[in-house]
């Protein structure tokens, strides 16, 4: 068991969920992309029921704590800059999948970037990488 890898997985998954929900809508495109992130991160070792339970758990945490507290918790769990950049990149990818990055999604990504203590170029890099990944 690698605690650093587990923390990275949890941060990637939660940040993706937070971005997907930042505009108040968790649409089918975002849900499918979120599920793909989870399945890929788990190397296919999860089933639909587990993903549904994970989404419910994340929704409960967001409802109980609010977005700012959840961003803070994600940021506290990741100390390595390369891991922080990866969390931002995956979150930016989720933001791009349903018609581009909304103002709400961009604000949440900015909160993550600031909570990590990264400069604005880190977010710009993450957004550019995500945009090129979803470009036709």
Predicted feature residues:
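Small-residue-enriched hydrophobic alpha-helices in membranes
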Residues: 1-136
């Amino acid at each position: 068991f690698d605690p650093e890898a587990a923390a990275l997985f949890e941060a990637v998954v939660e940040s993706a969920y937070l971005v997907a929900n930042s505009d108040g809508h968790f649409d089918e495109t975002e849900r499918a992309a979120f599920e793909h992130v989870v399945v890929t991160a788990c190397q296919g070792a999860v089933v639909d029921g587990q993903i549904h339970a994970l989404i419910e758990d994340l929704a409960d945490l967001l409802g109980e704590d609010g977005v700012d507290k959840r961003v803070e918790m994600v940021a506290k769990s990741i100390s390595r800059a390369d891991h922080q950049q990866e969390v931002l990149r995956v979150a930016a990818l989720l933001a791009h999948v349903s018609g581009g990055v909304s103002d709400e999604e961009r604000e949440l990504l900015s909160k993550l970037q600031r909570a990590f203590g990264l400069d604005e170029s880190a977010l710009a890099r993450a957004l550019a990488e995500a945009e090129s990944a979803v470009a036709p």
